Amino acid sequence: MEPFQTIRQGIIDRYSVLVDNPTEFAEAIHKPLKQSFRINTLKGDKENILEQLRNYDPEITEVPWNNNAYVSQLNNLGSSLEHFVGQIYIQELTSMIPPVVVKDVIDNNAILDCCAAPGSKTTQIAGMMQNQGHIIANDSRHARLKSLRGNLDRLGVTNATVTLRDFKSFPNTEADLYLVDAPCSSEGTIRKKNAVARMWKEKDYKRFTKLQKGLLNKACEMAPSGSTIVYSTCTFSPEENEKVISEIIDNQSVKVENIGINGLKTSPGITEWNGETYDKEVENCMRIWPHHNDTDAFFIARLEKC
């Protein structure tokens, strides 16, 4: 068996017990993803851009739960003129979820994107805000700032400030929304071969969990009462998802808000895994399984600071 097939089978074996339909889950893991993208209305009218894109692919389809997200049968839209000038942004559908679940709190507000590079969510939110309000786009790795700044510039974002700092030592900063799209084991991207194979070799849940808790604790500590904190990962691992949230509930004055998106099939967070029991509030978290919406896997929690 090829190494990547072994990786897939390991994921199927570990997580099939959590899903509603193990057969469909396994089939989805082996299917490649279609290319998805969103239209950047900072650089043009949506319908005009769509008309241009349909010259390449007449079968482009809108995603039912996000009226600015689309799926194409082509896999080379990243080479198109529309991508080059910033009218579209190639992005996995699940990566677009965090801004969608906080669209009620972003207008003209202050936002801190704690782990921003390469800028997928920063640019998405800037587009939703139409460059109003202010976004601090922080990342801890200098090597990733080039892609972050490049994407902000290409997409015409003017309301973002880029910072380079380990977020755990970031100065206390009041904001209305904190995004913690945390580094993770990336298991949920198994349908994209190259992204996962590299991460799977260092499958160290404890290491990631420690990092994730540090980032989320910092965001919760600096967040003022009434503000929103969103935590997300692209992994199946409960150790990096529900366990992190459960421990944050124990240590911070936060509550987990119940979230849902019309047109998107989701599952609640799990409360038991490998002999551990998590706080019942984690059921308000959102899990996305690959076989439910033909996407990557994803986890998201929306917290309110009390």
Which role fits each region the language model picked out?
Residues 1-306:
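S-adenosylmethionine
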